[in-house]
Curated annotation (Swiss-Prot):
SUPFAM superfamilies: Adenine nucleotide alpha hydrolases-like (SSF52402), Argininosuccinate synthetase, C-terminal domain (SSF69864). This is Argininosuccinate synthase. HAMAP family: Arg_succ_synth_type1. The lineage of its organism: Bacteria, Bacillati, Bacillota, Clostridia, Eubacteriales. Its EC number is 6.3.4.5. PANTHER family: ARGININOSUCCINATE SYNTHASE. It comes from Desulfitobacterium hafniense (strain DSM 10664 / DCB-2). Pathway: Amino-acid biosynthesis; L-arginine biosynthesis; L-arginine from L-ornithine and carbamoyl phosphate: step 2/3. The gene is argG. It is an enzyme of class 6 (ligase). L-aspartate binds at T117, N121, D122. It holds the Pfam family Arginosuc_synth. InterPro entries: Arginosuc_syn_C, Arginosuc_syn_N, Arginosuc_synth, Arginosuc_synth_CS, Arginosuc_synth_type_1_subfam, AS_cat/multimer_dom_body, Rossmann-like_a/b/a_fold. Its main location: cytoplasm. One of its GO terms (biological process) is urea cycle.
């Protein structure tokens, strides 16, 4: 019997895909659930997957690899999609697909299956990764094939086969959670005029419900990588979990946005990324202290392209690897300490220092100084403004002004 490896979460979509694959393809279904920080959500999956018809379930702890090999490179690049989205779902998919391909090789499977819909970005992210890593594998995307057209249809399909799902028609939110973020889509969020309900938030609280007293914290970075919190060395996963807890308490990192999907439509999502928001704020502050103007400005352009690559699912590509090489060079001196103030949804800079700081108080002071000769500015302005002057003279001579 041919085998297929399914990206399994235990949610509505992947729960009904197991019997659907068996009924329509006759394949043995091997499920794989990636532990990216869901924690207790994965505990009941073994029993559920088997009851749904899978022959076995792999639960792969990918948290450390997720943070060090996917989150940190994106953090160092400063990649943010459309100015808001910190890419929590986007860079998780290439890692999941990578492990699916590895398990397929181990099990001798001929196909990979996923539960991403035909309207979303995840189908692209999964399938581009599979094509890049093993183009011989068949890819099955049930949402593009079957007669199920809505989440309500999917719920009915599950109920008919006795499959329990953590979704009801009264609250049909689609959620994706990992150690970096929690996303919410669907339901009443599909109308962008609807304000998210306060009980939507699971990683933290609404800013107005946050404590009335601010909290300060200090983060140490080494070559662009966070290594300690308040002077205590922490592993990558522990550091992020701690920041999620602290940031969530203060309502940090809630993003409500309408974004442009790769597949051509706009969608509305509400994202909770407390720890990630803290790290991005701190990392950016340290870069502003340690990077020269030319490098910083060019890196900002690279960040836009990097964000698009990650969002579009082109992680396993020569361009992303080349951009990583550039970013790594820029991070050599991004070492130091950042102090942040957390207060009612705001994460603001309260201090930054680095042994590689390019900030010189002697040059920057508005007081008396003997370092900077202000007369030098006149020659610079004359040369820098020469093209503007020449154009103005031409326009005056030709009667254009």
């Amino acid at each position: 019997m041919k085998k297929v490896v399914l990206a399994y979460s235990g949610g509505l979509d992947t729960s009904i895909i197991i019997p659907w694959l068996k009924e329509n393809y006759g394949y043995e279904v091997i499920a794989m659930a990636a532990d990216l920080g869901q924690g207790e959500e994965l505990e009941p999956l073994h029993e559920k997957a088997i009851k749904s018809g899978a022959s076995k379930l792999y639960i792969e702890d990918l948290q450390e690899e997720f943070v060090t090999d996917f989150i940190y490179p994106t953090l160092k690049a400063g990649a943010v999609y459309e100015g808001k989205y910190l890419l929590g779902t986007s860079f998780a998919r290439p890692l999941i697909a990578q492990r699916l391909v590895e398990i397929a090789a181990k099990e001798g499977a001929v196909a990979i299956a996923h539960g991403a819909t035909g309207k979303g970005n995840d189908q692209v992210r999964f399938e581009l990764a599979v094509k890049a890593l093993n183009p011989d594998l068949e890819i099955i995307a049930p949402w593009r094939i079957w007669d199920i057209k809505s989440r309500e249809d999917a719920i009915d399909y599950a109920v008919e086969r006795g499959i329990p799902v953590p979704v009801t028609k009264d609250r049909p939110y689609s959620m994706d959670r990992n150690v970096w973020h929690l996303s919410h889509e669907g339901g009443d969020l599909e109308d962008p005029w609807n304000e998210p309900k306060k009980d939507l938030y699971l990683l933290g609280v609404s800013p107005e419900d946050a404590p009335d007293e601010a909290e300060y914290l200090e983060l140490d970075f080494e070559q662009g990588i966070p290594v300690s919190l308040n002077g205590e060395k922490l592993g990558p996963v522990q550091l992020l979990e701690t920041l999620n807890e602290v940031g969530g308490k203060h309502g940090i990192g809630i993003v409500d946005m309408v974004e442009n999907r790769l597949v051509g439509m706009k969608s509305r999502g509400v994202y909770e990324t407390p720890g990630g928001t803290i790290l991005y704020t701190a990392h950016q502050a340290l870069e502003h202290l340690t990077l020269d103007r030319l490098t910083l400005h060019y890196k900002e352009q690279i960040a836009l392209k990097y964000a698009e690559l990650v969002y579009d699912g082109v992680w396993h590509s020569p361009l992303r690897e080349a951009l990583d090489a550039f970013v790594d060079v820029t991070q050599k001196n991004v070492t130091g300490t950042v102090r942040l103030k957390l207060y009612k949804g705001n994460c603001s800079l309260a201090g930054v220092k680095s042994p590689y700081s390019l900030y010189s108080e002697e040059f920057a002071t508005f007081g008396r100084d003997g370092v900077y000769n202000q007369k030098d500015a006149e020659g610079f302005i004359n040369l820098f403004g020469l093209p503007l002057k020449v154009r103005a003279l031409m326009e005056k001579k030709s009667g254009l002004r």
